[in-house]
């Protein structure tokens, strides 16, 4: 099977890269082994929330105008900080065409409310997520009886510590008893599959309407809206106050919705999605990937002109940790890491951890190295890359998006895709 590009990994970076390639008329396939890390995410994306010295960033593009703001190995530096604004704008446009209703802009971070009632900088967030300022609001944080993946009292306590008037309430929704009887089934995704049915919408409205009479905003767990946010908009038009949704413990409804919307658009544009498959072997000829062999296709190789590695970090098994060191799982590419295991971590759990910056080494076109030499038709994108700490710097989503579109640009220029 011949393709212009095969992407290994179906997470945020892989899909965004595939979307741009298929828009440019290239034949593209994504080999996806399992669930994307988006299924475990808040549905918000960050671009740059802090600098290495710990100082907060309010205006990411302005901060990136200083070429020394980030270390030389950071993916933003490899891509070129002068390209970030253009690629961020392109990301926002691309996401909008896929269906997600997101708010925010790369020029200015907003502060989103987290499930614990704290504030965290973000670039893009679903429109139903509450953002600062909220000091003047009387907030009621609403839980669902028996639902353990969202703790309303913890969120309310954090809000009160910030000087916000916050109370809690709980709704019953007896119709959910069929799920409530089994704690392992009483999860946000299963609740959403029930509540997203149009005939169930009034049940939720009837439970929330009395609470909406006595406050300025209701915060409740994001346990509906798997396909879109039509139910949230329907409720917002009818309740007596604003309604906002907070992500729950995984699996996350906003994250799954974002992934599904991007996946549907990729397939609609002619992309091939190989679900539940895994690249088991890679054939290299003179420093060029000539064939990929996957679990499901047996002795039928995929023969791409270009390959994109978007296999993720440790969480997605794109990087593997052993006693001997860190290795990249598919090709054994060169990896940035500290030689001594004692230097992998800080004893303070909440301090920036060195291992977060481990990952594949690339040149400034995002071509990775194998035994010190670049692989000519291979690109690495997203969280498999080394040189950045997505937690401490608040840049995980941005690195995925920016590197995905940048690699797609390199491929289009070389492959002759429509510009």
Curated annotation (Swiss-Prot):
Keyword Membrane part of the UniProt annotation: no
Catalytic activity: a quinone + sn-glycerol 3-phosphate = dihydroxyacetone phosphate + a quinol
Family recorded in the similarity comment: Belongs to the anaerobic G-3-P dehydrogenase subunit B family.
Cellular component aspect of the GO annotation: glycerol-3-phosphate dehydrogenase (FAD) complex
Keyword terms, alphabetized: Flavoprotein, FMN, Oxidoreductase
Annotated EC: 1.1.5.3
Cofactor(s) demanded: FMN
Functional summary from the UniProt entry: Conversion of glycerol 3-phosphate to dihydroxyacetone. Uses fumarate or nitrate as electron acceptor.
Pathway where this protein functions: Polyol metabolism; glycerol degradation via glycerol kinase pathway; glycerone phosphate from sn-glycerol 3-phosphate (anaerobic route): step 1/1
Keyword Flavoprotein part of the UniProt annotation: yes
Alphabetized Gene3D superfamilies for the sequence: FAD/NAD(P)-binding domain
Assembly information from the UniProt record: Composed of a catalytic GlpA/B dimer and of membrane bound GlpC.
Annotated gene: glpB
Gene Ontology biological process: glycerol catabolic process
InterPro entries in alphabetical order: FAD-dep_OxRdtase_2_FAD-bd (IPR003953), FAD/NAD-bd_sf (IPR036188), G3P_DH_GlpB_su (IPR009158)
SUPFAM superfamilies for this protein: FAD/NAD(P)-binding domain
NCBIfam families noted in UniProt: glycerol3P_GlpB, PRK05329.1-1, PRK05329.1-2, PRK05329.1-3
Alphabetized GO MF terms: glycerol-3-phosphate dehydrogenase (quinone) activity
Protein name: Anaerobic glycerol-3-phosphate dehydrogenase subunit B
Species of origin: Enterobacter sp. (strain 638)
UniProt superkingdom: Bacteria
